[in-house]
Design a protein with these regions (language model features):
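Bacterial Sec-dependent N-terminal signal peptides
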Residues: 1-27
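Mature, structured domains of secreted/extracytosolic soluble proteins
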Residues: 24-189
Length: 189
């Protein structure tokens, strides 16, 4: 290998290292929120972040089974109310296993899209809507039905069509295509 080739390779290697260092520096500058033991990066989309959360394995599997991965990787924006694995564990035994079967894809999709609001709504915006609504705010989901948001003390809650309430346990997990609010109960249309 001649000297010119070595210099070119060395130059390319230096540029690559400089670029990857710049990317790493950019990632560390982002304001992240820890969810399920993993940092959630605002520069990543909902799916890219969710797959790293140890607390959302069931949700990720359900999203895959429903064929919603591509949708939630799209530009959105979306507000996702993300139930934890513990929330799914509260469902009657065998419910999750039944829902992820191919023949139940339509029902699973309905349940999952009931956890998604169009647009990017911060907890502050939802809180303001609740205040403006004299203690509650109805919001239409992507599925088509409404959820009722309400507050108690410093906590934000959401009630489903069946009257079950979920507490927002981690709010404002910003994503490149929306925001996630972690909840402790699965909502049912």
């Amino acid at each position: 290998m001649n000297t010119k080739s070595k210099i070119t390779i060395l130059g390319i290697s230096f540029l690559f290292l400089a670029f990857s260092g710049e990317v790493n520096a950019q990632m560390t500058k982002e304001k992240t929120v820890m969810v399920g033991g993993a940092a959630m990066y605002p520069s990543k989309n909902i799916i890219e972040n969710a797959v790293n959360s140890k607390d959302h394995k069931t949700l990720v599997a359900a999203v895959k089974a429903a064929g919603l991965v591509e949708t939630l990787q799209g530009s959105g924006p979306f507000t996702v109310l993300a139930p934890t694995d513990a929330a799914f564990a509260k469902l009657p035994k065998g419910t999750v296993e039944t829902l992820v079967k191919p023949e139940n894809k339509e029902m699973l999709t309905q349940i999952l899209t009931y956890h998604v609001l169009p647009g990017k709504l911060s907890a502050k915006e939802i809180w303001a809507a609740v205040k403006a609504g004299n203690g509650k705010s109805m919001m239409k989901t992507v599925e088509g039905e409404e959820l009722t948001f309400w507050t108690k003390g410093k906590d934000l809650y959401v009630k489903d069509a069946k009257g079950n309430s979920a507490k927002v346990t981690i709010a404002d997990v910003n994503q490149s295509n929306g925001v996630i609010h972690v909840i402790d109960t699965v909502l049912m249309p």
